[in-house]
């Protein structure tokens, strides 16, 4: 209908995140067709452009918080280049057997130090038992804050930020 087409045209005129970006659409599509994660939406929104020169906006000195289904802290996409976790802490409100954060009487807090200890352990869940069975929180954190994957097929919007998690 005319209203649908009008709405579609209006959206196409809306400026993206960083002005009207130009990107090599063909290279993005080739990467997607090669089995890499489709980064077209990140390119179209301007995220890839602001990550590069001259802005270099990658989330450095920023902490992003996620209140969600938890996080799969063992994933490589949530680590820095040295393999350490970029998660500053997890407050798992579903686990009542650990120490709650200061000022609270429920849930269990897992610090960055505890998470890093778990990452080098043979039994990580014995140290930090927090999980994300649903996966939603992990996906959201990866999209917003994921580190670049080694083969270049993925990077999050703010790959240099720190991550704070509250699991409900």
Where are these predicted regions, by residue range?
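Autoinhibitory propeptides
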Residues: 1-63, 70-86
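Subtilisin-like serine protease catalytic core
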Residues: 52-168
């Amino acid at each position: 209908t005319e209203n649908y087409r009008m709405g579609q045209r209006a959206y196409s005129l809306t400026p993206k995140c960083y002005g009207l970006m130009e990107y090599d659409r063909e290279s993005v599509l080739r990467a997607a067709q090669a089995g890499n994660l489709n980064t077209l939406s990140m390119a179209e929104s301007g995220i890839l452009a602001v990550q590069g020169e001259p802005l270099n906006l990658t989330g450095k000195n920023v902490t992003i918080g996620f209140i969600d289904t938890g996080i799969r802290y063992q994933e490589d996409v949530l680590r820095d280049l040295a393999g350490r976790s970029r998660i500053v802490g997890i407050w798992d409100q579903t686990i009542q057997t650990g120490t709650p954060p200061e000022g609270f009487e429920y849930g269990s807090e897992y610090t960055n130090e505890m998470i890093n200890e778990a990452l080098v352990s043979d039994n990580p869940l014995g140290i930090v038992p927090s999980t994300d069975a649903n996966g939603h929180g992990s996906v959201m954190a990866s999209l917003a804050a994921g580190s670049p994957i080694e083969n270049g097929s993925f990077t999050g919007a703010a790959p240099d930020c720190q991550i704070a998690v509250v699991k409900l």
